[in-house]
Amino acid sequence: MKQNIHPNYQPVVFMDTTTGFKFLTGSTKGSKETVEWEDGNTYPLIRVEISSDSHPFYTGRQKFQAADGRIARFEKKYGKQ
């Protein structure tokens, strides 16, 4: 492998700005803003608008719309025979 061409992979804290939920993970993204984590170490802080803590798919607050498929529309239009 070539030296000095790979991005710096480091631990960072992502914070969901909607709920305030934070989680520590590895990333190549950096930030000048830092936060002290539960283990006492300081890590770069990256703010995100949506995470698994606030996304409707993961929270179970998802709204489903009735979407008819082609067959259902055909049967509705011409009646099931």
Curated annotation (Swiss-Prot):
Disulphide connectivity of cysteines: none
Pfam families: Ribosomal_L31 (PF01197)
Protein keywords: Ribonucleoprotein, Ribosomal protein
Molecular function, one GO term: structural constituent of ribosome
Keyword Ribonucleoprotein part of the UniProt annotation: yes
InterPro entries: Ribosomal_bL28/bL31-like_sf, Ribosomal_bL31, Ribosomal_bL31_B, Ribosomal_bL31_sf
One record GO biological process: translation
Gene Ontology cellular-component annotations: ribonucleoprotein complex; ribosome
Source organism superkingdom: Bacteria
HAMAP family associated with the record: Ribosomal_bL31_2
Entry's family note: Belongs to the bacterial ribosomal protein bL31 family. Type B subfamily.
Subunit: Part of the 50S ribosomal subunit.
The protein's name in its UniProt record: Large ribosomal subunit protein bL31B
Organism name: Lactococcus lactis subsp. lactis (strain IL1403)
Organismal lineage: Bacteria, Bacillati, Bacillota, Bacilli, Lactobacillales
